[in-house]
Amino acid sequence: GALWWRNVADTPVKKFDLVMDVNARASYACAYHCLPHMLAAGFGHIINMSPPIHLDMVPGKVAYSISKFGMTLVAHGLAAEVKGRGVAVNALWPATVIESQASKNFGLGTPANWRKASILSDAVLAIVSHEPDALTGRALLDEEILQEVGVTDLEPYRCAPGGELIRIAGHNAVSGTFGTGAGGSVKANPLSIDNPAL
């Protein structure tokens, strides 16, 4: 996906178009091209990496939020369109900062504040373990779907002990920053596709 966390005044239309192309448009295009094959087979799972829609995350990230919420709307809308036809469409998002090149390169805390990427892969496995018609049309958090399938201990997903996880969605998430949940916060550096040629 494309990350661009800037104010509208700092987001040229060319950047907006790029973020929309990489996030919302790509999600739509992938679903459009895969859907006929899934419907013909009577089975499939489409999972978009996009958040539940909460407007408190929008200020300072309007272009990014529109692009990611667009992906979530694809999940909700398409799920309703194909309901009962053996194809599930859901959105999945981490509740906390995940160890990644983005979290490392842009100083989003330290390993003690992150979870491992394996929480997302396990969440995907939890989603696809359901029959498509049994779990569709939802915007899920990783820890939420894992708890639904009986995972009660999320500690093995921590990158390092001792720190407080930085919550970016769900319970105790702090709007506008990556909140630590304890009154403090880790300000996110603007993540961007800063190549001037873009």
Region locations from a protein language model:
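A short, exposed helix-loop element centered on a Lys and neighboring polar residues
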Residues: 31-32, 76
